[in-house]
Design a protein with these regions (language model features):
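Residue-level signal for inorganic ion chemistry
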Residues: 2, 13, 46, 75, ...
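N-terminal subdomain of lithium-sensitive/metallo-dependent phosphomonoesterases centered on the IMPase/IPPase/PAP
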Residues: 1-43
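DPxDG-like acidic metal-binding loop motif
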Residues: 32-87
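An extended, acidic
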Residues: 99-177, 181
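N-terminal low-complexity segments that are often proline-rich with Ser/Thr-Pro
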Residues: 184-185
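ATP-dependent small-molecule kinase catalytic core of the GHMP/sugar-kinase superfamily
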Residues: 76-107
Length: 185
């Protein structure tokens, strides 16, 4: 499903744009990208998708000089289209404005995280992770960084934190959730 989705998205973008495309499945050398390029994750949450867990999506973004400028995340299980851009500083779900949470106290906030396959499970690493997690009201592991971006953009959670993520995993966190707190993500 990933490769079919990616090929379709690349075909559509290429018919309308000459900018290069960085895609999860086919990749592209960062040397070949230039200052402006598209980023595609054709199926974020593949493991969820493969097990019929309805937490997965398609994400597409435009990056200029390594800064996310605009993008969309399509949560096809719920027919929710999230969009955002740095020019308007407005995030939307199905053309309705959404807002990030105003909570700033971790004790009242939700952290979304994950444990990728290359996670360091040493005692010291796990102790540090547990210590950090104890500061939050709730911890959620949902299996999709892009869906996490949607939850943050719509105020359902306050922060996403995970090591080992790639650009196509996290670029949507920054442009679907424009806020003064972008630097915290």
């Amino acid at each position: 499903a990933d490769i079919e989705s990616e090929n379709l998205i690349k075909s559509i973008i290429s018919s309308e744009s000459t900018y290069p495309i960085l895609a999860e499945e086919s990749g592209k050398s960062s040397n070949d990208l230039g200052d402006v390029f598209w980023v595609i994750d054709p199926l974020d949450g593949t493991s969820n998708y493969n097990r019929d867990i309805p937490i997965c999506c398609v994400s597409i973004g435009l990056v200029i000089e390594m800064k996310p400028i605009l993008g969309i995340i399509y949560d096809f299980n719920n027919d929710h289209m999230y969009s955002g851009d740095k020019f308007s500083n407005i995030s939307k779900m199905n053309d309705i404005s959404i807002n990030v949470s105003q909570k700033s106290d971790k004790k009242e906030s939700i952290l979304i995280t994950g444990l990728p396959h290359n996670t360091d499970y040493s005692d010291s690493s796990l102790n540090n992770m547990i210590k950090d997690m104890q500061d939050w009201q709730k911890i959620r592991m949902i299996g999709s960084a892009a869906i996490a971006a949607c939850y943050i953009a719509s105020g359902k959670a306050e922060r996403y934190q995970e090591t080992g993520s790639y650009l196509w995993d996290i670029v949507c966190l920054l442009y679907t959730s424009p806020s003064p707190r972008d630097d915290e993500l």
